[in-house]
C-alpha cells in the first residue's frame, strides 16, 4: 500500500482508537492468528480492521502472509505512537477518576514469575481488595523480567511492578514487600538425593553439575550461584526447575516454589544450613507519577495485607 498523497490524519475518532488498540494487540501477540483469542475476533475480521486502519493512516503497517508477520518501518513508528497515545488516554482517565473518587480504568502490573506460590500472598490479597472496591477496574498482569518491569514503570506502560531489589534506578521508588528464601535442590535420581546431609561433603556439592540463572540477581544471591559448578543456564526459575528435575543438575529454587515437589518426594534441599540465600522483593512505582486513584488504592491494600 503506497503512502497517501495527503499525510494529514485530521481528527482521531473513537473508531480510530479502537483500530489502534487492535493493532497494538496484534503486534504484542506477534501475529493475526495469535491475537484471535485475545481480541475475541476471527482472523478475517482482524484482517479487515487492519485494512481499515492502513487506509485511514494512508500507509502500510505490516507485512503478512506465508513469510509471517512483520512490521514495516512506518508500522514500528505507529506502534510507538499508539503506546504513547493509549498511555496518555489512561493518564487522562486516571485524573478524572481522582476527581470523582470512583475506581475505574486499568491497573497494569508487571510481576516476575513464580511468585503465586508465596504463602504470604500479599499481591493476591491486594488485587482482591482492589477489585472489591472497584468492580469496573480492569487488571492487566504481565509476567516478565525485572529489567523489563522497571523500564515499563519508567516509561508509563506499567503502573506498578514487583521486582527483586538489585540495582535501584533513580527514577523509581522501591517499597519493601517481603523476603523470598531460596535453597539448593537436587531431584530424585541424582547421586546426592538418597544420602543424608551428614554424609555429604560441601566439596561434593560444589563439584556437582549445576544450573545457573541467566537473569540478574542481587550480589549475595549471585555469589551463591557462582560458587557452584555451573554447566547449564536458564532464563527463568521454571527453566531452572526443568533442569533440576532431570536428575542431572543441582540448582537454587525459591523454597515456596519447590515446596510441592519436596512434599511429593521429587526434590530435596542440599545442606540447607550452608546453601541458602534470601532476596528482598519490592513494589516499584515511578517517582513524580501523576495522581492515580486505582494505583493508590492498590498500594494501600498491599500495605495492610
UniProtKB/Swiss-Prot annotation:
Tagged with keyword Transcription regulation: yes
Positions of the HTH lysR-type domain: 15-72
GO molecular function (one): DNA-binding transcription factor activity
PROSITE patterns: HTH_LYSR (PS50931)
Mutant lacking the gene: phenotype: Cells lacking this gene grow normally on putrescine, cadaverine, and GABA, but growth on beta-alanine is completely abolished.
GO BP terms: positive regulation of catabolic process; regulation of DNA-templated transcription
Keyword field: Activator, DNA-binding, Transcription, Transcription regulation
Tagged with keyword Transcription regulation: yes
Described purpose of this protein according to its UniProt entry: Involved in the degradation of beta-alanine. BauR activates the transcription of the bauABCD operon.
PANTHER family according to UniProt: HTH-TYPE TRANSCRIPTIONAL ACTIVATOR BAUR, HTH-TYPE TRANSCRIPTIONAL REGULATOR
Similarity section: Belongs to the LysR transcriptional regulatory family.
Record protein name field: HTH-type transcriptional activator BauR
Gene that encodes it: bauR
Amino acid at each position: 500500500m503506497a503512502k497517501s498523497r495527503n499525510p494529514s490524519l485530521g481528527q482521531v475518532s473513537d473508531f480510530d482508537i479502537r483500530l489502534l488498540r487492535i493493532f497494538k494487540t496484534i503486534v504484542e501477540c506477534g501475529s493475526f492468528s495469535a491475537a484471535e483469542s485475545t481480541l475475541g475476533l476471527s482472523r478475517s475480521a482482524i484482517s479487515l480492521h487492519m485494512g481499515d486502519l492502513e487506509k485511514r493512516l494512508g500507509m502500510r503497517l505490516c507485512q503478512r502472509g506465508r513469510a509471517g508477520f512483520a512490521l514495516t518501518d512506518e508500522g514500528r513508528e505507529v506502534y510507538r505512537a499508539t503506546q504513547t497515545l493509549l498511555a496518555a488516554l489512561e493518564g487522562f482517565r486516571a485524573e478524572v477518576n481522582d476527581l470523582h473518587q470512583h475506581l475505574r480504568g486499568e491497573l497494569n502490573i508487571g510481576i516476575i514469575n513464580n511468585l503465586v506460590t508465596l504463602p504470604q500472598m500479599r499481591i493476591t490479597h491486594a488485587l482482591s481488595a482492589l477489585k472489591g472496591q472497584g468492580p469496573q477496574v480492569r487488571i492487566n498482569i504481565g509476567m516478565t523480567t525485572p529489567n523489563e518491569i522497571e523500564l515499563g514503570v519508567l516509561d508509563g506502560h506499567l503502573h506498578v511492578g514487583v521486582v527483586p531489589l538489585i540495582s535501584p534506578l533513580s527514577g523509581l521508588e522501591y517499597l519493601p514487600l517481603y523476603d523470598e528464601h531460596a535453597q539448593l535442590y537436587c531431584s530424585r535420581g541424582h547421586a546426592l538425593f538418597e544420602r543424608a546431609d551428614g554424609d555429604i561433603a560441601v566439596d561434593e556439592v560444589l563439584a556437582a553439575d549445576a544450573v545457573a540463572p541467566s537473569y540478574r540477581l542481587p550480589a549475595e544471591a549471585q555469589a551463591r550461584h557462582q560458587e557452584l559448578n555451573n554447566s547449564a543456564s536458564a532464563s527463568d526459575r521454571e527453566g531452572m526447575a526443568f533442569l533440576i528435575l532431570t536428575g542431572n543438575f543441582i540448582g537454587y529454587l525459591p523454597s515456596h516454589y519447590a515446596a510441592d515437589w519436596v512434599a511429593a518426594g521429587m526434590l530435596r534441599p542440599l545442606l540447607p544450613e550452608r546453601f541458602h540465600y534470601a532476596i528482598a522483593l519490592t513494589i516499584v512505582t515511578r517517582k513524580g507519577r501523576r495522581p492515580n486513584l486505582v494505583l493508590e488504592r492498590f498500594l494501600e491494600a498491599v500495605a495492610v495485607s
